[in-house]
């Protein structure tokens, strides 16, 4: 009996060791490497006010889960809305429910709103209190229309008897327009409206940055904002570089259809209008696909770059730096874009 028990123990340990790698590989299977091939060709269409975020694997765009919805590492909660994935006492890597983090109340126009509470200060906006700060989204879903090939001169007008304004296009085609090549891009959504000072009469509005004007080399992108003391709508510009033109060849690695993001192996200096950046940078670039998809910036930041110009002059310009890129099938039908030439001495113009 004792001998039989001694032989059974090693067999049991062997079975446990054999089962353990299976569990590990099962967890890893949830995040395949590489990501290519498992993401939908089209980006997700999320409900108004719901952002698209990268899943827990950093592979695919998914609609951020909202309060009370189920969540998991592959289906993250809307962190920008103050939500987190509550997985219960164990707090493991399984499914959970999106919950609101406890935070401070908000005061707007003499009214007190609890953290997470939603209200409408007017028919045009829906606002939410988020840990002492108020964020608003337009209910009219018009956003701010940037000039484009089909509507180079947009203008917003009021409609009698209706809350929301309406965009119309002025047929002013006598103005000379630039001929930059538009980069492949995903459609941009209008950002939320930041209302942090209840005493101000101006509700700040800012659009997303537009697509870079060039698919390779130095270009620029634009956005519209009224974030200034005069509360006036102005168009801002920033420099951008999706990739160097000498790297305009798709990846030919075996089994690799796309390279989303790649970092420069050596420090480089940016060049703009015969000016060279004072500092060196190791920027990230968007790769290319050989299956017809486009790779464009997904998450970016803006920095101030100082350039040294001829005759000892110096120039500072805002410039986009890429954090991550995404590959998708939402490619433009034409390479013609309507951009006004960029003023080398200014990054802002009134609308």
Curated annotation (Swiss-Prot):
Pfam families: Cys_knot (PF00007), IGFBP (PF00219), TSP1_CCN (PF19035), VWC (PF00093). Keywords: Cell junction, Cytoplasm, Disulfide bond, Gap junction, Glycoprotein, Growth factor, Proto-oncogene, Secreted, Signal. Belongs to the CCN family. This is CCN family member 3. Glycans are attached at residue 274. Gene3D superfamilies: Complement Module, domain 1, Thrombospondin type-1 (TSP1) repeat. Immediate-early protein likely to play a role in cell growth regulation. Its overexpression is associated with tumorigenesis and expression of a N-terminal-truncated version of CCN3 gene in chicken embryonic fibroblasts (CEF) is sufficient to induce the transformation of CEF in vitro. Residues 1-24 form the signal peptide. Residues 27-101 form the IGFBP N-terminal domain. It is found in: Secreted; Cytoplasm; Cell junction, Gap junction. Residues 258-332 form the CTCK domain. Disulfide bonds join 31-57, 35-59, 39-60, 46-63, 71-85, 77-98, 258-295, 275-309, 286-325, 289-327, 294-331. It comes from the Eukaryota. The gene is CCN3. Residues 201-246 form the TSP type-1 domain. GO terms for cellular component: cytoplasm; extracellular matrix; extracellular space; gap junction. InterPro entries: CCN, Cys_knot_C, Glyco_hormone_CN, Growth_fac_rcpt_cys_sf, IGFBP-like, IGFBP_CNN, Insulin_GF-bd_Cys-rich_CS, TSP1_CCN. The keyword Amino-acid biosynthesis does not apply. Its main location: secreted. It comes from Gallus gallus. Brain and heart, and at a lower level in muscle and intestine, in the embryo. Lung and less so in brain and spleen, in adult chicken. Residues 104-170 form the VWFC domain. One of its GO terms (biological process) is cell adhesion. One of its GO terms (molecular function) is integrin binding.
